[in-house]
Regions:
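Short glycine/proline-enriched coil/turn segments at helix->beta-strand junctions
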Residues: 7-9, 17-18, 49-55, 126-131, ...
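Generic structural signal for residues in well-ordered beta-strands
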Residues: 11-13, 22, 131-133, 166-167
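Midchain, well-structured core segments that form catalytic/ion-binding scaffolds
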Residues: 1-111
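Short proline/glycine- and acidic-rich turn/helix-capping motifs at secondary-structure junctions
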Residues: 17-21, 63, 134-148
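Short, histidine-centered active-site or binding-site loop motifs used for metal coordination
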Residues: 26-28, 136-139, 189
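Redox- and metal-dependent alpha/beta enzyme cores, enriched for Fe-S-associated oxidoreductases
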Residues: 115-132
Length: 189
């Protein structure tokens, strides 16, 4: 209760037999808007870092707390980027730990103009901590110029009908991998 009150993170520890059970409650958010959520995995990592654990797990926890923490923009890693297509978002989406290894899956949505730089920047940050990027699953970024006739037409019609700003977002990457030429646009995006 003290931890929750002082940090705002909903993490509890309880004893069940000879095991300690950590429970963290978060708030789900899409990986393109992680700042709208509360990452339960990250909250547990920050809790564990506060315990002063030794060894390789302790080194990982310290790295995570210092270089990532509760941020969702890559700023502690020196990777904060933004362009006309949007800003970089960074979210830890999965973690698997056993006696021999720790695997973590990070979802990084990066601005169009920084696509080649992001993987190199992240690799450079994790290497000194003894970590290796085992797999990089990078999708090609996707962009339509704002002055493209289709974009101008869609924006004009949308604004006329709704009275709302129609500036396209940088979401929709999943759709763009499947449907060439799709534009993240309108109230759904």
């Amino acid at each position: 209760e003290e931890y929750r009150r002082t940090t705002g993170r909903d993490v509890t520890a309880s004893l069940e037999g000879n095991r300690i059970l950590l429970t963290s409650r978060g708030l789900c958010a899409h990986s393109c808007t992680p700042f709208n959520g509360k990452n339960a995995i990250v909250a547990i990592l920050m809790f564990l870092d506060g315990l002063g654990i030794d060894g390789s797990m302790g080194a990982f926890l310290r790295f995570f707390a210092e270089k990532i923490g509760m941020t969702t923009d890559g700023s502690l890693l020196g990777m904060k980027r933004e362009d006309e297509c949007g800003r970089l978002t960074f979210s830890l989406s999965k973690m698997d730990v056993d006696e021999d290894r720790l695997e973590w899956v990070v979802n990084i949505r990066y601005p169009y103009t920084y696509k080649d730089q992001v993987t190199a920047d992240f690799t450079a940050q994790v290497a000194p901590a003894g970590m290796v990027m085992d797999k990089v699953d990078a999708h090609n970024t996707y962009r339509f110029p704002m002055d493209h006739p289709m974009i101008r037409t869609l924006r004009g019609v949308y604004e006329e009908l709704t009275g709302k700003d129609s500036t396209p977002g940088h979401e929709g990457g999943t759709y763009a991998q499947v449907v060439p030429g799709i534009v993240p646009f309108g109230s759904i995006f």
